[in-house]
Amino acid sequence: MEKKRVVVTGLGALTPLGNTVDTYWDNLLAGKSGADYISKFDASLFKTQFACEVKGFDPLDIMDRKEVRKLDLFSVYAMATTKEAFEDSKINLETVNLDRAGVVWGSGIGGMKTFQDECFNYKDGDGSPRFNPFFVPKMIVDIAAGHISIKYGLKGPNYVTVSACASSTNAIIDALMLIQLGKCDFIVTGGSEAGVNIAGIGGFN
C-alpha cells in the first residue's frame, strides 16, 4: 500500500517565547529565554522559583467569559493555538469531509490546576462535598481534543495521547499515520500544557 503524502497547512503557537508563530520564531532565532520568576502564584517558599510561563495572554481575546469558566487553562491554550492554525491554513471547512477530519492532541497532565483548586476548596470548606459540576470535564486530558472538534465540527478520530514529555510528539506521529494510511484527510494536532501552578511546581520539585 502506497502511503499518502502529508503536508502541514497551518501553524499555531502559544509559548513562553511568544503568543503567535511569528513572535515565537523571531524570539527563538534571537536566542531569547522564556524563563523568569514565577508570577502565577507566590513561589517564595518553593525550591524552584522560576518557570517558562505564557505571558500577556488573555483568554477573553479568543472566547467569551462563559466559555472560559468551563475550561482549564490547558484547554484554553489548545483552543488559542488551533484558532491561529486554522487562520494560517485558510482552510474552508465547507470543502472538507468532516467525517474524515479529526483531532489528535497531546497533554501530559491536563487540568492539574482544576484538580488543585477543587481540592483546596474542599479542604477549606465545611466538609460538605460541594464540587464544581465542571470539575471532571475541565480536568480530563481528552477534553482539549473534544472542545476543538466541537468548535470546528470535526467528526473523525478524536483523542489525546498521554506519554509525559513526549505526548505532543506522539500526537503528531499518530496524526501523520492516520493520513498516510488513508484513514483521515485532515487532522488538527499538537499539544498543550498548563503546569505552572502550586501542584505542578511542587510536584516536579
Residue ranges and their predicted role:
Residues 23, 74-81, 167, 171:
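Generic hydrophobic secondary-structure packing signal
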Residues 1-67:
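ACP-dependent fatty acid/polyketide chain-elongation machinery
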Residues 13, 71, 161:
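Generic anion/oxyanion-binding catalytic loop in active/binding sites
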Residues 40-91, 141-155:
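A glycine- and small-residue-enriched flexible loop/hinge segment at structural boundaries
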Residues 11, 106-108:
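Structured loops at beta-to-helix junctions and adjacent beta-edge loops in soluble globular domains
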Residues 2-3, 16-19, 30-38, 87-99, ...:
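Acyl-thioester C-C bond-transforming condensing/cleaving domain
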